Amino acid sequence: MHFPLPWQLILILLVILVIFGASKLPEVGKGLGEGIRNFKKALSGEEEEKGKEVKKEGE
């Protein structure tokens, strides 16, 4: 897998800064963090449901 070079990451961050502006970055970061958190919860919830189904079938 190809990872971006440091100068590419800096360029991406500058583009994000220009698009959203410095005042919006905390809001964007918060929204992104909440989205990732909800995604992880949804994944773990599906795994728990699958585990419950397997236990019910095995009983």
UniProtKB/Swiss-Prot annotation:
InterPro entries recorded: TatA/B/E, TatA/E
Top-level taxon: Bacteria
Any one GO BP annotation for this protein: protein transport by the Tat complex
Keyword Transport: yes
UniProt KW keywords: Cell inner membrane, Cell membrane, Membrane, Protein transport, Translocation, Transmembrane, Transmembrane helix, Transport
Record-level GO cellular component terms: TAT protein transport complex
Subcellular compartments: Cell inner membrane
Keyword Transport assigned: yes
Function statement: Part of the twin-arginine translocation (Tat) system that transports large folded proteins containing a characteristic twin-arginine motif in their signal peptide across membranes. TatA could form the protein-conducting channel of the Tat system.
Entry similarity comment: Belongs to the TatA/E family.
HAMAP family with a match to the protein in the record: TatA_E (MF_00236)
Subunit structure: Forms a complex with TatC.
Protein name per its UniProtKB record: Sec-independent protein translocase protein TatA 1
